[in-house]
Amino acid sequence: MKYDKLIIVESPAKAKTISKFIDNAVVIASKGHIRDLPVYSISVKIEDGKFIPRYEITPDHKKIVEDILHEAKDKKVYLASDEDREGEAIGYHIATILGGDIGSYDRIVFHEITKSAILKALENPRKLNMHAVEAQETRRILDRIVGYKLSPLVRKKVDYGLSAGRVQSAVLKLVNDREKEIAKFIPVTYYELPITVRTDTPASLVSHKELKITKQCLQDKQQALAIKASIESDKFKVVDITAKKASYKPQPPFKTTTLQQAASTELGYEPSKTMSIAQKLYEGVETPTGRKGVITYMRTDSLNLAKEAIESIRNKILTMHGKEYLSDAVRIYENKTKGAQEAHEAIRVTDVNFTIEDAKRYLEPEQFKVYKLIYNRTMMCQMSDSQIENQTVLINGTENVIKITGRKVLFDGWTKLKDKATEDIILPNYQIGSTIEIQAVQLDEKQTEPPARYNSASLVKTMEELGIGRPSTYAATIALLLNKGYVRTEGKAMYITDTGSKLSNFLEEYFPDIVDDKFTSNMETKLDEIALGNTDMHTVLGSYCIPLIEKIEKGNTDIPSLRVPDKRTGETCPSCKEHELVIKTGRNGEFKACSGYPKCKYIERPKVPVESKENCSYGLCPDCGEVLIKRDGRFGPYYSCSGYPKCKFMSKWPIAKEKCPTCGNWQQECASKTGETYYRCLKCKPIQPRKKDKKSKKKGQ
């Protein structure tokens, strides 16, 4: 068969899937950008107010470029990179190396990788969007100048190995500011009075005499005790019973941020992991009808759904669940995200007939979990409202008013697809005028809590709300902060590290624009304006980069150094036996290193006191039997063998003293996402729940 088409996509997985749909086409993957700014220099020339980038074919793309040039000789070329600014730029660079008129190349786009979508795209090609290319190039140059000009100053004035970035530094400030809020928070003690009436029904206090009871209003213990005594001695009667019906609409289909948030909350996945899994589902997996993409493009801030998709979703709801579960009218969701690209679709499944049951048989476990989230949200968004009857019983005493609330699900609607259904709270059959007996009144002492630390879900949500970054950069930005050791996690909570705090405080003091969320958001708006053709790259870059470069050059001499000077030890390096050992300060504290670096890379880890085997806190090494030591790493605490470097055992969790009851091997003492402790054998890996001490939850009794 003669191949007369060359389709150039970004990823090999996508190429593999598309090649099964088109018989007369060669499909090649560019594997991302074939040209980029080389890493060995800033590679941006500023001349007469113009910013001129110098691109090179990256070393690992030279063979791919040769293949593209060879295959393009006698074929019609279709540029089929992703439909976003990065994809548009990738297509532009490919067209550039192919030569000729850039405007002569056909550009095809699709939001799902199915045969019908690819054929439709081939029938409706367009030309490269040069405004989108210019917006991407502006972002690339901007980030290069910030990174290559500001980062050396940061390393010179703050510490080795640090870096600054336009988006990453603004996000780092969010985490740092939250840490400051928590540090200065002063807790306030307050009291609550949970009430139980006869038949074990919980009730709450509405008012006492003239005092309206609100959360945290009782901060005097004697006052709370007096009210408690008043309730216990009061006589109560039902004075009002109301039942109000309420409708609850389903949530819209997923976009990038809401998918990342749902996967973080429900599955415990980091945004980068969610996007990696979603990428595979988009590019193509095996299904009962062959290999295809099973979700639409996953980097989107749109809530739009294609007309054909809505029809198939609604038909599936009708056949699977019946007419009563289908919304009366088609649900259309409005985009509230600033700069949302309406041409894109929301994230949805491409084929509603590839059901959750099918997916469980064909997909890997982690892929299945993400697909299930997307499938259910795809269906829910066109289902009928859930109907709830909320019941309130108002009960008056001589000095106190209390209330009892209940709930009855009249119709589950879209909540039918939730893993955890809304449960009824059925109340006894109360009558107006009937007497109510108080069964118990507790006095609970509580304290106000500081603002919650960010987790992946809440940080992504805040980035979106403030306009910091774009859907394609959220996950990568968070991963970067973690990988560089500026932020660490404990469970889901994000903590600023000493290094991250020091860096953020420095940037906030000397380069406030870099870390200001409003400034960063405004820059994203300017990039959107370039993409719309309302302004140009040189105007935007000139207004920002020239003053920044001048400020950095001035800072090289004017900003005092915050770096801790090396301390001399008088000891000779045991490795090179030439230079003196010095004490340096790194991310995790002080350490000894050779002053001859980088010629000699000797490092001496700080000595940690080793406990006795009989009284060790973190268990014994399962490999050699030596005591485990707790250390602080760039990703948080970990446990390693005190016999290092002879034994290189490391573990995220300490080793339990109790051995596995199944095989007698060593076990890790782990903590679940909810903070509960469990044991995990290193050999057979069964999970053994830890026995809990029975403690009363009641206070003040």
Language model features: what each stretch is:
Residues 2-5, 16-17, 25, 75, ...:
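Basic, low-complexity terminal or inter-domain segments flanking catalytic cores
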Residues 113-195, 244:
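C-terminal or mid-to-C-terminal helical accessory/interaction module adjacent to the motor/catalytic core
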Residues 241, 250-263, 289-297, 450-462:
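Short acidic, hydrophobic short linear motifs in intrinsically disordered regions
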Residues 282-296, 484-493:
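A short, conserved structural fragment
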Residues 3, 82-83, 159-163, 243-252, ...:
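Conserved short loop/turn motifs at secondary-structure junctions
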